[in-house]
A protein has these predicted regions:
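Terminal-appendage/accessory-domain detector
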Residues: 1-95, 192-205, 212-435
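Generic structural signal for well-ordered, non-membrane alpha-helices
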Residues: 5, 9, 33, 125, ...
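Hydrophobic alpha-helical hairpins/lids featuring a short glycine-rich hinge
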Residues: 82-138
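Generic structural signal for well-ordered alpha-helical scaffold segments
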Residues: 110, 160, 273-277
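Glycine-rich, mobile lid/loop segments that gate access to catalytic sites or pores
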Residues: 114, 118-205, 221-228
């Protein structure tokens, strides 16, 4: 059976009234987290660019923190804010994903259709489940394809739920999203650019446009996955279709939140750095052992000389050196002064990163990292198996709120966001203010 058809069959029956309380609570936590990290990006250079670009897309859909635009640009704009800090949630499997990237699109079409918070929660549950299954099916990274290719399919599944598309329309929406829009992994190769966040924003934009097209009757190729020139035959012959045999509502519980503003493979690196009790001036050498994905993604050649925020938040040596020196890791770590700080650079020169095959075999059930520091006084070793926020070591509600407040959120907003079921999506969006 065509995968798009399986997804379409799954989408329609999902109903808020039948969702478990822990699933509803988790969806609310992701909404809170998404708004928190979006607010933290308000002064970022890409956001200022997007505000100027928005002048060309006049519309009536409310944007996060003020302004109005067209549905597709609102999805792009909201998602760029959510994604930019690399501080939103993550799913790690054969392919990684930042599932809350799709929430920016849900804010847009939820506002367009005058829907309520409970409709938003339904869309999140659907989108997360589809995203998790796609990431379980194959690795895109190893094929040179970017994970936002899966994001847009997951997003359009959630948007199909929001728009109440029937099964045939949902298949068309998936096809109109996937077939024209295969994203290249070059986005995340070497020195990173603003497009690291833009790729997710663009995927949300494309999913939004495809969903609206399908709602109005436009058809797409009927077999976007299984067709002769479809996704599986052209890109992913190893695609494991069986993962779609047991679609549920619990995919969101397998995804993870971030305590620190770093690429997820570096969350454990920050924790390890904070546990070390050493004088930076005494360091002779630092050996780091981790799994293949972490070494490949955050310790490749370009990550040893980061020159911008986009590369620094994907740089294991920078993140570890900063943490050892400052005994904290927050957004100020990405100032130009910090990125080019000589003391941090000197510590980076003493770091070596190695793949530990045992750790590779454990990943992604665990995210192990071991940091061994050799000093004038001897050796100190710290191992972290699962950082705080990982799905098997989740942040509690108080920690989620603490993150929201530290990113300049307001307590009254939190009180509202925990009770959004009957609130209009557009009212939720317009009530959230900037810094």
């Amino acid at each position: 059976m065509e995968i798009a058809e399986k997804i379409a069959e799954y989408v329609n029956p999902i109903n808020f009234e039948n969702l478990k309380e822990n699933i509803i609570r988790e969806a609310k936590r992701r909404i809170i987290d998404s708004i928190a990290v979006a607010r933290g990006a308000l002064n970022s250079p890409p956001h200022l660019i997007n505000k100027n670009v928005g002048k060309y897309f006049q519309g009536e859909i409310p944007l996060l923190f003020g302004g109005y635009s067209t549905p597709d640009f609102a999805s792009f704009y909201n998602t760029f804010l959510i994604r930019y800090l690399d501080f939103n949630d993550t799913y790690l499997s054969k392919e990684p994903l930042h599932p809350s990237d799709m929430i920016g699109a849900f804010f847009s079409l939820g506002s367009l259709m005058d829907l309520k918070g409970k409709d938003l929660i339904e869309a999140i549950v659907v989108g997360y489940e589809v995203g998790v299954k796609l990431c379980d099916s194959t690795s895109l990274r190893k094929k040179g394809i970017d994970h936002v290719t899966f994001l847009q399919v997951a997003a359009v599944a959630g948007l199909s739920k929001l728009l109440k598309l029937n099964e045939k329309e949902t298949v068309n929406a998936i096809s109109l999203t996937l077939v024209p829009n295969i994203a290249l992994r070059e986005t995340r190769s070497g020195e990173l650019s603003m497009w690291k966040a833009g790729a997710a924003a663009d995927a949300s934009r494309k999913a939004t446009f495809a969903a609206i097209l399908a709602k109005n009757g436009l058809t797409g190729p009927p077999k976007p996955f299984s067709g002769k020139m479809g996704f599986i035959n052209v890109i992913a012959k190893d695609f494991d279709s069986s993962v779609f045999n047991n679609l549920s509502i619990e995919g969101i519980l397998k995804t993870s939140m971030k305590k620190y503003p770093v690429e997820y493979h570096a969350e454990a690196v920050v924790e390890a750095g904070l546990r070390l009790n050493i004088d930076p001036n005494d360091i002779n050498k630092i050996d780091v052992e981790t799994y293949e994905a972490a070494k490949t993604i955050i310790a490749d050649e370009e990550k040893w000389n980061p020159t911008n925020k986009e590369t620094a938040d994907h740089s294991l040596p920078y993140i570890l050196a900063y943490t050892i020196l400052r005994k904290d890791f927050w957004l100020d770590a990405y100032s130009k002064e910090s990125i080019f700080n000589e003391k941090i650079r000197n510590i980076m020169k003493k770091i070596n990163v190695y793949e530990n095959e045992k750790y590779t075999s454990i990943y992604p059930k665990e995210l192990p990292v071991k940091v061994i520091v050799y000093t004038n006084k001897g050796k100190e070793e710290v191992e972290v198996r699962n950082p705080r926020g990982y799905y098997n070591n989740p942040m509690n509600d108080a920690e989620v709120e603490e993150k929201y407040l530290r990113l300049n959120g307001k307590r009254e907003e939190l009180n509202m966001l925990w009770k959004i079921e009957e609130l209009k999506v557009k009212d939720i969006v317009t009530s959230i203010k900037g810094i």
